[in-house]
Amino acid sequence: MNDILAKILAVKAEEVATARQMRSEAELLREAQARQDVRGFAQAIEDKIAQGKAGVIAEIKKASPSKGVLRENFDPAAIAATYAVHGAACLSVLTDVQFFQGSHDNLRRARAACPLPVLRKDFVIDPYQVISARAMGADCVLLIVAALAPSQLRELETLAMELGMDVLVEVHDAKELDIALSLKTPLLGINNRNLRTFETSLQNTLNLLPQIPAGKRVITESGILSPEDVKLMRSHQVHAFLVGEAFMRAEDPGVELARLMG
């Protein structure tokens, strides 16, 4: 792992160590367990799809390592509100500071501004981050197979579910998919962007579809830029999408969501 992902994970390990010194895991766990406000993330996606619509996880991110700043005029609450009005099923909020210019506060503000369930989008490598996700109000956490050993994936999934959250497991290739299929979560994200090179191809989702059993909800991630991309995926029975960049670059992200999903 000699690449962008490795660099990010090294920073995450430092961040977790620092956070633990500021606040004990036991104290954070008490706060997370005291929250009784989980919104059903997987259910929100299924509800949209049952209505014949796309289940869109609409992302809130200011910047990315590959593209730099995506949105100068960045107001997480306003973006969340327009996403909700224009039919998003859920939100994804970047909480990574160094690489995506995100924050915990962005997640809190976005969630407070609308009724949608929220994914904490970050590079989770430690139970502390899962507990922190629930404490800040997240309804779902992202686990990236490329970043974690199978035993870690199982441990973190179990913890997230014990705290009432859903889990989105993300894969990029057939080897990672095999590992992900051993987890309990029905939410299977296929990232069309290679996290090692940051290149994107929608073919990635289509190539992996034949290997995915019934009972898993496929969410195609990255590279969905046009209504044609959406139609292509839906013609292959992929009805859930995680979209960020296309919305962030638009004048009104919610209006762009409605346009993209037709």
Swiss-Prot record:
Origin superkingdom: Bacteria
Pfam families per UniProt: IGPS (PF00218)
Single Gene Ontology MF annotation: indole-3-glycerol-phosphate synthase activity
Example GO BP: L-tryptophan biosynthetic process
PROSITE patterns reported in the protein's UniProt record: IGPS
Pathway annotation: Amino-acid biosynthesis; L-tryptophan biosynthesis; L-tryptophan from chorismate: step 4/5
Record has Acyltransferase as a keyword: no
Reaction catalysed by this enzyme: 1-(2-carboxyphenylamino)-1-deoxy-D-ribulose 5-phosphate + H(+) = (1S,2R)-1-C-(indol-3-yl)glycerol 3-phosphate + CO2 + H2O
Record key words, sorted: Amino-acid biosynthesis, Aromatic amino acid biosynthesis, Decarboxylase, Lyase, Tryptophan biosynthesis
Signal peptide range in chain numbering: none
Keyword Lyase attached: yes
Assigned protein family: Belongs to the TrpC family.
Protein name: Indole-3-glycerol phosphate synthase
Gene (name only): trpC
